[in-house]
């Protein structure tokens, strides 16, 4: 059973996240291993496995990028273990330039410049995310997979910038 079916949701990118959370809580209560403490060893093991599956499904579907990756996996794209890389040279050069800029910001410890950088990267991420949503809605799986690969770069860059922000604030 796929994760969308497990939560009673349609297998599409845009989901009702409130319904997801409510169903997660219901499933957790229903399959919590403690409820099977007096059961057979097989029942206890099944409850632990089901609980782990429910938790993994929830973690996957609640985050936009992992939800997109999972949806693409249902259409034959194994982005988690694939060897495909981003082939868009302009995008890769832009990422290299942004990484260098982040390194410069770290060296200068310029928190104002860092704040501006984080906002700019977030805008880039949001624009790509919207592009990906449209591609998924239109079943443009190849294009969506490529956009997810690009979003991974931006997500990693954003995370690095936020870590630097925390580091600079600790001073």
From Swiss-Prot:
Cite the GO molecular-function annotations of the record.
ATPase activator activity; protein-folding chaperone binding
Cellular component, GO annotation: iron-sulfur cluster transfer complex
**Which GO BP terms apply?**
[2Fe-2S] cluster assembly; protein complex oligomerization; protein folding
Q: Where are the transmembrane segments?
A: none
Q: Which UniProt keywords apply?
A: Chaperone
What are the residue boundaries of the J domain, all occurrences included?
2-74
Q: What subunit structure does UniProt give?
A: Interacts with HscA and stimulates its ATPase activity. Interacts with IscU.
Put simply, this protein is called Co-chaperone protein HscB
* The organism of origin for this protein: Salmonella newport (strain SL254)
Lineage of producing organism: Bacteria, Pseudomonadati, Pseudomonadota, Gammaproteobacteria, Enterobacterales
Gene encoding the protein: hscB
């Amino acid at each position: 059973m796929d994760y969308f079916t497990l939560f009673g949701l349609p297998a599409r990118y845009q989901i009702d996240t409130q319904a997801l959370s409510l169903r997660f809580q219901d499933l957790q209560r229903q399959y919590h291993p403690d409820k099977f403490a007096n059961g057979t060893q097989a029942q206890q093991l099944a409850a632990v496995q089901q609980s782990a599956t429910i938790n993994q499904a929830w973690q996957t579907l609640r985050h936009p990028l992992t939800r997109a990756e999972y949806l693409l996996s249902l259409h034959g794209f194994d982005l988690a273990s694939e060897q495909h890389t981003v082939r868009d040279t302009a995008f890769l050069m832009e990422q290299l330039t942004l990484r260098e800029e982040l390194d410069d910001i770290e060296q200068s410890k310029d928190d104002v410049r860092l704040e501006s950088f984080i906002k700019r990267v977030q805008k880039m991420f949001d624009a790509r995310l919207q592009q990906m949503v449209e591609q998924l809605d239109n079943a443009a799986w190849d294009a969506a997979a490529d956009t997810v690969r690009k979003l991974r770069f931006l997500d990693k860059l954003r995370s690095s910038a936020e870590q630097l922000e925390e580091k600079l604030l600790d001073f």
